[in-house]
A protein has these predicted regions:
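Long, charge-rich alpha-helical interaction segments
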Residues: 128-132
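Active-site neighborhood of HAD-like aspartate-dependent phosphohydrolases
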Residues: 72-123
């Protein structure tokens, strides 16, 4: 079966060095050049026989990302893309924005960092962080929503996915009050996140219902794939931290986006530039 290896970056010069390892055995090389990012796509009649570890290491040194779609995704577009939200589809962390409103920024930020690095159980850390928000007026949710910084290219990614018939889902350990409006803003088809309990217009410091944690993210990916009638091998999972590893394992292709080392190691596919629509290079022909 034919295969492809893709180099992607917002700095075209960073593609040259790793490209020298890919060019000699490729049947052809094509380029995608936009105002914001570039990709070099190397096509192979069969599987790439070179040393992918060496390619990834050299790309990391230059700041380029490496995408190596396999199976169905090597020859056809995805049917479903599922993205983490905080620090993936957004450049901000929802809980940190709310913590600033509550005057608990430093305390909550420390817990968040440890959780995303895999040092703390997510469910326990979520409860600890949300407890810090007890008594916060519901108006802070709108403040946090307005302060949310959407990752460049998010809406463009959704539009590009829809053009090839793929659905897009947002799954987050964050909160429905922020994730649902974001999904509507960028045109995503599905969303799942945690719901904050509110009584008398104030946060109680608790969440309602099942927690969207590491395992739940994979469950939602499978659920949306089934609803969309898409084989799992035609799904893509995109994330940045330890909480994304289960959905990485469930998807046909896992992509670590501007990610922490634990996610990069698990996904083996990377985008290092802050243009999330660069992942459309996976299916560009």
């Amino acid at each position: 079966m034919s295969s492809r290896v893709i180099l992607v970056s917002d700095d075209r010069s960073s593609l040259r060095s790793p490209g020298t390892l890919l060019w000699p055995d490729s049947a052809c090389m094509r380029g995608i050049h936009t105002n914001d990012w570039a990709a070099h796509i190397f096509e192979y009649a069969m599987s790439f026989e070179g040393d992918m570890t060496q390619v990834r290491e050299l790309a990391a040194q230059t700041g380029a990302g490496v995408l190596h779609p396999h199976g169905a995704l090597a020859v056809e577009p995805p049917g479903l893309i599922v993205c983490d939200v905080d620090s993936t589809v957004t450049r901000t962390e929802a809980i940190d924005l709310l913590a600033e409103c509550a005057g608990k920024a430093e305390e909550v930020s420390e817990i968040t960092a440890r959780a995303m690095a895999g040092e703390l159980d997510f469910a326990e850390s979520l409860h600890e962080r949300v407890k810090c928000l007890e008594g916060l007026h519901v108006g802070a949710l709108e403040e946090a929503r307005k302060a949310t910084v959407v990752t460049p290219g998010a809406a463009e990614l959704v539009a590009a996915a829809h053009e090839v018939g793929a659905a897009v889902g947002l799954v987050s350990g964050g909160f429905t009050a922020l994730v649902n409006p974001l999904a509507a803003e960028i045109g995503a088809d599905f969303s799942a996140s945690n719901e904050l309990e509110i009584v008398d217009d104030h946060l109680t410091g608790r969440v309602v219902g099942d927690i969207v944690d590491r395992a739940a993210k994979a469950t939602w990916l499978r659920r949306w794939a089934e609803k969309s009638e898409v084989d799992l091998e035609r799904t893509i999972a995109v994330g940045d931290g330890a909480n994304d590893l289960d959905m990485f394992a469930a998807a046909g292709l896992a992509i670590a986006f501007c990610a922490k080392p634990v996610a990069v190691e698990a996904a083996r596919n990377t985008i290092r530039c802050e243009r999330i629509d660069a992942l459309r290079a996976v299916w560009e022909r």
